[in-house]
């Protein structure tokens, strides 16, 4: 199964360098967001896609993401960092690992 990345050009270039061959660049313009929505719908329907990585900012602009078991859709931070902040990350780690991370 393939891993696909959707996001801004800098994030996409980084993942291409890491070996992800199917990568789609989008900016945050209205037209580009609509193209991203359509591409996401297309990717979700494909049988050969196992994981879709999408930047948090793009996912936020797209709106509600499809609720599917496969492919797995993971939101990732872009070059500016997470839009959800450290507090959410701490909570996720606390739930997953069972310990609280403090600075």
From Swiss-Prot:
Example GO biological process term?
Answer: proton motive force-driven plasma membrane ATP synthesis
Under the heading InterPro entries, the entry gives: ATPase_V1-cplx_f_g_su (IPR008218), ATPase_V1-cplx_fsu_bac/arc (IPR022944), ATPase_V1_fsu_sf (IPR036906)
Record-level GO cellular component terms: plasma membrane
> What's its membrane topology?
Peripheral membrane protein
Q: Which GO terms describe its molecular function?
A: ATP binding; proton-transporting ATP synthase activity, rotational mechanism; proton-transporting ATPase activity, rotational mechanism
Question: Localized where?
Answer: Cell membrane
Which domain of life does the protein's organism represent? Answer: Archaea
What S-S linkages are listed for this chain?
none
Alphabetized Pfam families for the sequence: ATP-synt_F
Q: Which keywords does this chain's UniProt record carry?
A: ATP synthesis, Cell membrane, Hydrogen ion transport, Ion transport, Membrane, Transport
Function recorded in the entry: Component of the A-type ATP synthase that produces ATP from ADP in the presence of a proton gradient across the membrane.
Known partners and oligomeric status = Has multiple subunits with at least A(3), B(3), C, D, E, F, H, I and proteolipid K(x).
Return the similarity comment.
Answer: Belongs to the V-ATPase F subunit family.
NCBIfam families in alphabetical order: PRK03957.1
Descriptive protein name: A-type ATP synthase subunit F
The taxonomy runs:
Archaea, Methanobacteriati, Methanobacteriota, Thermococci, Thermococcales
What gene is this protein a product of?
Answer: atpF
């Amino acid at each position: 199964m393939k891993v696909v990345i959707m996001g801004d050009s800098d994030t996409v270039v980084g993942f291409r360098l890491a070996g992800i061959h199917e990568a789609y660049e989008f900016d945050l313009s209205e037209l580009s967001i609509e193209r991203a929505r359509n591409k996401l719908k297309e990717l979700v329907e494909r049988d050969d896609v196992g994981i879709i990585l999408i930047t948090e900012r793009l996912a936020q602009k797209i709106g509600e993401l499809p609720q599917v078991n496969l492919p797995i859709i993971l939101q990732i931070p872009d070059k500016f960092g997470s839009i959800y902040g450290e507090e959410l990350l701490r909570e996720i780690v606390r739930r997953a690992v069972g310990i609280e991370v403090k600075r």
